[in-house]
Amino acid sequence: MPKDPQPASTISLASLPAIGAALDGGIFAGLTTKPDSTHCAVVLLPGGGTDLTWKKAKTWAEEQGGELPSRPVAALLFANVKASLQLGWHWTSEEFDASYAWYCRFYYGDQFNVLKSYEGSAVAVRQIPLTA
């Protein structure tokens, strides 16, 4: 069951708090643009999953009311809210191929791929579309 069953559906750019401030049950980490050109506020949700395969990490993130971060969003988290992250490697939402997926090490911010069957950590993010 999601921790925040009523997340914000949209948010205006003018109403965004400072990076690192509370927003929608988490911490505002910055802005991103999805592949469909939707601009979104990124919220790092509280807590973290550990000892999770990639598939289990995706399920865990959904249970938190969010999703695993994409590779660009993981880089955004590292750049803007590193102090709120556990060091070590964390799954991203992106597959490399059928057997491998990408992860981000929040100690250095670098990204590599690893077998999806390996157990790692995870963070969950929520992306809130921006309105004018």
Predicted features, each with a name:
Residues 1-66, 115-116, 121-125:
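Extracellular adhesion/carbohydrate-recognition regions
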